[in-house]
Amino acid sequence: MALHFQSLAELEVLCTHLYIGTDLTQRIEAEKALLELIDSPECLSKCQLLLEQGTTSYAQLLAATCLSKLVSRVSPLPVEQRMDIRNYILNYVASQPKLAPFVIQALIQVIAKITKLGWFEVQKDQFVFREIIADVKKFLQGTVEHCIIGVIILSELTQEMNLVDYSRPSAKHRKIATSFRDTSLKDVLVLACSLLKEVFAKPLNLQDQCQQNLVMQVLKLVLNCLNFDFIGSSADESADDLCTVQIPTTWRTIFLEPETLDLFFNLYHSLPPLLSQLALSCLVQFASTRRSLFNSPERAKYLGNLIKGVKRILENPQGLSDPGNYHEFCRFLARLKTNYQLGELVMVKEYPEVIRLIANFTITSLQHWEFAPNSVHYLLTLWQRMVASVPFVKSTEPHLLDTYAPEITKAFITSRLDSVAIVVRDHLDDPLDDTATVFQQLEQLCTVSRCEYEKTCALLVQLFDQNAQNYQKLLHPYSGVTVDITIQEGRLAWLVYLVGTVVGGRLTYTSTDEHDAMDGELSCRVFQLISLMDTGLPRCCNEKIELAILWFLDQFRKTYVGDQLQRTSKVYARMSEVLGITDDNHVLETFMTKIVTNLKYWGRYEPVISRTLQFLNDLSVGYILLKKLVKIDAVKFMLKNHTSEHFPFLGISDNHSLSDFRCRTTFYTALTRLLMVDLGEDEDEFENFMLPLTVAFETVLQIFNNNFKQEDVKRMLIGLARDLRGIAFALNTKTSYTMLFDWMYPTYLPLLQNAVERWYGEPTCTTPILKLMAELMQNRSQRLNFDVSSPNGILLFREASKMVCTYGNQILSLGSLSKDQIYPMKLKGISICYSALKSALCGNYVSFGVFKLYGDNHFDNVLQAFVKMLLSVSHSDLLQYRKLSQSYYPLLECLTQDHMSFIINLEPPVLMYVLTSISEGLTTLDTVVSSSCCTSLDYIVTYLFKHIAKEGKKPLRCREATQAGQRLLHFMQQNPDVLQQMMSVLMNTIVFEDCRNQWSVSRPLLGLILLNEKYFSELRASLINSQPLPKQEVLAQCFRNLMEGVEQNLSVKNRDRFTQNLSVFRRDVAEALRSDGNTEPCSLDMMS
């Protein structure tokens, strides 16, 4: 396609459409034109035209974007050209320092990319792209604007060096990053600190925007230096509180100088909030410095300086009124405890005063509950870890936590109770609605609350009694929900959550009988509240209290009910006196009564039903508890009366959202586990249990073919599919599963088949049915190993085949779908079908050979449906949607293992699609997918190798098999690049990547090498010749060692030998490629 834009005016119109245009069509066209411009031979000249003569900043931004994409290509531009681009941009920004900030940023990113990708490039024995540091120093000697540009260059370069590009070998990135760390990063940090000292030494005019910008950029540069991934650990940022900064040993001198920390504390106190929070961010990293950087005296001194800084900030807290400063300071405090032990903290001279200040700061923060809950997380983390460390402190110095921890607990409790009235009266967002944050904070509080537990318990008892009495007064007489009742219910909800929290905080190795007795005192009150609330149903009810009660019951279950329960626990002493609950059997009765009550009265409140059923499910896991549960009357009632009449959530009325039906699977899983305890081979008992479902199915059968009540039928079928999936999941024995199969076949399975055919375009209906079929196909615990006289395995597969074929054929009639519709409407169903098919193929309960033998086409049909669905999915979607990739690739592994005749008889375009999907899957980060790809490739390569090895030796009776193998061989000969590309990918993975499944990679690689020895020799030569002369012989020896003792066959013994050699090879090559970045270059651009 020829370029349509030649003049500057046309290019600027393109920029307008691309960056500020509102017409979507024009923007898409502009994006296409941009890609065309990048591929054009005139790209550089057009970029130069835009930069030098463009009239808008967007023209300059387009030029920078094009240059960035151009220099980032896998096939790099010549060294001279990249040097010219770098020098041109440096001169350009030097001559125009007042460019728009986003243009300067984009141009500097181009310089950073060029520098990183060319870090090891050599001309005339010099690393030509490392001169950037010297170039930047020229900027620093100019005006303030030039100085800012110089700092941004260093900052962007540091960030770029730290940025992992997943499209390139990770080993190459680590090599560049490590070299930059060792040769330049320390100098950059020293330079940045010296600039800050210079700025701080002069009177700072904060009204001067340029000076403010300079300080901001220098602080960002320091932060980028300290955030550098020094050892390639790629720490998960979500685990922020666990971070340790692995500062290199060569930086010790910088960190040992007290002036370094003083500088950043002084900057915090001197700068406005936008800048001071950057200074605090730097201090967070300083506080996170690895312990091993210092010896013991040095560490104590360094900690002392940090504590002094904390004290100074808390004594002058004005800056903490800014949310950014407040958040960073909370992180700073949490990092102190992460990296220093309580025994070290108490030895600091200022510790008593500082812990008092921190306690007061925490109490104030908790009292302002509406302010920055994300920051409070770090404060609670600090106190949680401090209190958790108390049993292990050996120091004689007082830690004072027994004084301050109860105050923190009290502040949390009282502040949450006080918040309720404000939330209700001012109609604010209720913190209790954000359950993720509430649970996280409660989990932290449970440790703190156990310090001086007597005080916590006394406070909670007093508050609970007071609020429960007030609530009872408001209920009698009951005159409807009032503001006062709502407030009281909110306070009780918090108290129940808090009681559950402290009970759940019991630790076996630190608990005492007195503490258990206190847990009993608190638990009594919640059990009494349960009775009070349940007697008022359905007239008065409160969802928040119910959710809190379920939280408490679950915490009590984890702590005091279970297989390892201490029967002598004092928790039951007080409960026995007040409630008559003497042991865990009585508690289980209370649990089950509560569950039945909730399921009966809370049918319209999905959160309560869902949490109740999850609690029931948790109770039903564990044989000892199950034996106790089945003796309880409430359980017997559930097993005989699981209908919508008793449990409204099982109804199909329009009041229930279809998404609410999901909880029915959980209900029937738990219920079936309870049934299984005493079921044995009692078919009558099973039939009685299934009676409500039988009635429902018979109703559906009667009205399915009529045109009325179709919506009701659909909802009934969705509910039934979810119910049966829960039942099937829990039936893990052959006897019980056979009962279910006999109940479903042949009457009800065809009904589900018809539903899929009728409502194939409605995933709310098809997804539950397909998931049920996928569950039925699972041979878990060998439950599908039917008796030898039983045809059930084949009958089940035939039904699955019909359903998959029906769905697969119908879903393709939907045509093209939008990006947001393609997964829910199509790909999700396909992934479930593939999962079901994989379970059938790998289940070992069907002899697939009999289908062809007896002229049954169900097996062939389902394989053809697999192909049709596959060809309707793009390769990118296969890998983009995780559930789809994790069902397709294991299925393909089964097919290549046991059904190679199907694979080799595929039409060439289909076979090419399958092999391409394997090739692309080899490089994915998902080890499940990449391992399946390796295994599938190994089966294909092994088949091909054996065919070639036996060519010409086959007797006449095997001619058909030979012809099938010949077809595959012919395809590979027509497309030699397919296997060559995969060999290249696997070699690249072994040599350059962090290979997490080395054994899997090694298996197909041997076959590929034996089939393509010539191409392997080319790859070997490519790698060896790309290295400096001193390394070439070392690498050549590595390759010789790789094939040493390896024979020309694929026997298990030979494969194992190759796998062992490959492990040594990988280690030796990594050692050979590892070089001192100061001395010699090493190109790692071998294979793409």
Swiss-Prot record:
N-acetylalanine PTM sites in chain numbering: A2
One Gene Ontology CC term in the entry: nuclear pore
Reported tissue expression: Highly expressed in testis, moderately in pancreas and weakly in other tissues studied.
Localisation: Cytoplasm; Nucleus; Nucleus, Nuclear pore complex
GO molecular function, one term: GTP binding
Modified residues (Phosphoserine): S569
Role: May function as a nuclear transport receptor.
Family from the record: Belongs to the exportin family.
Official protein name in the record: Ran-binding protein 17
Phylogenetic lineage: Eukaryota, Metazoa, Chordata, Craniata, Vertebrata
